[in-house]
Design a protein with these regions (language model features):
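Classical Sec-dependent N-terminal signal peptides that target proteins to the secretory pathway
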Residues: 1-22
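Secreted/extracellular ectodomain signature
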Residues: 21-137
């Protein structure tokens, strides 16, 4: 009986141990003005590390996922992307930021230090930072 129990826990661990949420997106994304404003609203408010900011692949739609509890479990990207896709007529969505850290890599010069954004940053500075990394023209 104990062997079967260990086997079931092992299978459950494999199913829920999806690391796709840890892989940054790497493609050319251009954000619309509305998406930039929504991103600014997202980073200007109180954020937890578990919060996610998602964008559609065309950069026109956004979705904010906020952890409703104090402690949230890590989930795969599909968990976060489903409600975003539903909101935007089945357009594919990807995670753009986790907490205040941009995880979508648009350019080779993005380093881990340069993608953190402070809560007190102005909209103009956000636009400059997004332009620097190729998210806006």
């Amino acid at each position: 009986m104990f062997k079967y129990l260990k086997f079931y826990f092992f299978i459950i661990f494999l199913i829920f141990n999806n690391h796709s949420h840890a892989v940054p997106e790497a493609s050319d994304l251009k954000l619309s003005n509305n998406s930039i404003n929504e991103f600014f609203n997202y980073i200007s408010s109180q954020r937890k590390n578990a919060d996610r900011f998602l964008v559609t692949l065309d950069g026109t739609g956004t979705f904010t996922w906020s952890c409703p509890q104090t402690l949230c479990f890590p989930a795969g990207e599909l968990f976060y992307a489903k409600p975003c896709s539903k909101k935007h007529e089945k357009k594919k969505c990807k995670i753009f930021a986790k907490g205040r850290k941009i995880v979508w890599s648009n350019s080779a010069n993005m380093s881990q230090n340069s993608i953190n954004i402070k809560q007190s940053i102005s909209l103009t500075d956000v636009k400059k930072k997004l332009k620097k990394f190729g998210f806006i023209d």
